[in-house]
Amino acid sequence: KKGVFGIKDKNHLAIEAIQKFTDETNIDMCILGDFYPSGDEYELVYAGTKRLIPPHGIPLDVGCLVNNVETFYNVHNASIGKPVTQKFVCVTGMVKEPKSFFVPIGTSFKEIIEFAGGTTTSDYGIFVSGILMGKLSFDTSEVVTKTTAGIIILPKDHYLISRMNREIKDMNRIGKSACDQCSYCTEFCPRYLLGYDVQPHK
């Protein structure tokens, strides 16, 4: 019945280009702040509709469907009988020319890194599809799949890589020993600010 196009404020050129096509439609433009996690679906649904998804729920629970641009692109292609054989992949971090590429599924990380001019460090790890929700790999022969969103190249001695290699029990022990119960993590938690009972300091 109605569409909402969420886009971060920093993407000025994209906003101008898209606005031309949404003015005479039932699609509203929702300008989001330039911060994480404004792309989170709970945040998106609230920003675009002022509806709150129930805890542990999904957007459909409040009559919404959330998808990204690439998904809509692939749905369109499927509607005309074109299968998904290529993927948009962002390459950033310790590479000479950080870029986004449209590559065939099955392209190796080694090839993509070469497309980006190569690395600026010889000893590195690869975060696949994000630092928070992705995984860590050291295998450049690994390939792009339908779920690969991007790769981030970081030196092997980077804090995030050493942290990812820790066991959960060690991470919990360090967290408990360092926490002074200031509750800032809770007070600034995006879900808590929306009214959800998420209190990570406890």
For each feature predicted by the language model, list its residue ranges.
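Immediate flanking context of iron-sulfur cluster ligation sites
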Residues: 118-127, 167-181
